[in-house]
């Protein structure tokens, strides 16, 4: 535990305990907290010890409390991909500084910070200062929430849930998604993301949170995924169409139909876009998604040995 006159910072490696202690805080702005809420809920559902240490070298959650003991901010580090970034939601500046200093003090190298501004930037810049490194923005993100849905015209074919027979294709397209998104945004290197394994893909298919669009010939031409709802919010993504099938309306219609299904059951829908990708921003705004907040992915580079 780290404390100051105004803030107490507590770490835990127990996702169930974290959710129990922060449930009210996360529910205040459930769209903003979608990543931490959904990822942590998924880990609670998983069997104890699921995943290997190599897949997840860091696994913690942090709770910042004010002087009255009320939760004032949260963060986590559970990413199974290099540079294993922390994810930070809004918190007081002294809490963000305390988080960076606590990690540095225990010798935990931090290669990236994702999440809400300005807190994520404060953590990244303080980490860089302490380590003699440099914090830089890799990706500017925008979080959108569905307002009034505008259902676009349907291209030929139909949307259907993926089945286990589709698992190999779904896995390949999940893995291709980051590279395709980076290309559309004009970047040469994608931001690191989870390297999905087959068991994770099968679990998503069994949970019916992966959909495919089949064209009129029965060929699969598009994939859209989502998260299981957490605090009444689902996050749509990834949204992937192979290069030779783009521009035909598959993504717009698939996301709209999936959003319509969730909204009919009272679930709020949100998604992230890369601000540098004009294609995706236009597509989602056209079907009724509206900006909520800008977020950021930062990397921290430190000098190597002389």
Language model: regions and residue ranges:
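Short amphipathic alpha-helix that is part of the acyltransferase structural core
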Residues: 1-36, 149-190
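Conserved beta-hairpin
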Residues: 41-79, 202, 206-224
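Acyl-donor-binding surface of acyltransferase catalytic domains
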Residues: 67-71, 77-156, 298
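A conserved beta-turn-beta hairpin within the catalytic core of GNAT-like acetyltransferases
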Residues: 81-86, 228-236
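Conserved acetyl-CoA-binding loop-helix of GNAT-fold acetyltransferases
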Residues: 93-102, 237-243, 247-263, 281-286
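Conserved beta-strand-loop-alpha-helix junction that forms the acyl-donor binding cleft
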Residues: 114-120, 243, 271-285, 298-304
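Conserved active-site alpha-helix within GNAT-family acetyltransferase domains
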Residues: 118-136, 252, 276-293
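Recognition helices and adjacent regulatory flanks at domain boundaries
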Residues: 213-215, 226-227, 248-261, 272-274, ...
